[in-house]
């Protein structure tokens, strides 16, 4: 079970942002997309950024996160139409559609967390 932080400006539950999250056993904490979250971020394995509606704001926030030294993988949640706007400049580990099923969501979370763990071990032998 992974510890996830979902950053969203939606007032709904995580299952409304990405329905598959509601079916998985991960521990999901939800906070607003605000810079103040980065002052004392909770200990998590992965950040999920809600990029479904405001792509420019989501991109700016992912760049802010990477510039502050937060050292966990970031996944952007977007719609199919938003995929065309996302590129390497965002500084994210992965992107996933908000309509992805539970198996895909779980696999992608495990992969980005696993890759991050391997990178951490390689950088700190």
Feature names for model-found ranges:
Residues 1-5:
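Extreme N-terminal starter segment of soluble prokaryotic enzymes
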Residues 88-93:
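As written
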């Amino acid at each position: 079970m992974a510890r996830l932080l979902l950053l969203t400006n939606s007032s709904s539950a995580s299952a409304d942002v990405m329905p598959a999250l509601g079916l998985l056993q991960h521990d999901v904490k939800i906070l607003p997309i605000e810079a103040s979250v980065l002052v004392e971020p909770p200990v998590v394995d992965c950040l999920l950024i809600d990029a479904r509606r405001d792509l420019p704001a989501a991109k700016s926030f992912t760049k802010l996160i990477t510039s502050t030294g937060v050292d966990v993988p970031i996944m952007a949640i977007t719609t199919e139409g938003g995929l065309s706007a996302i590129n390497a400049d965002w500084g994210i580990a992965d992107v996933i559609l908000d309509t992805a099923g539970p198996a895909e969501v779980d696999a992608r979370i495990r992969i980005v967390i696993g890759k991050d763990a391997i990178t951490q071990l390689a950088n700190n032998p």
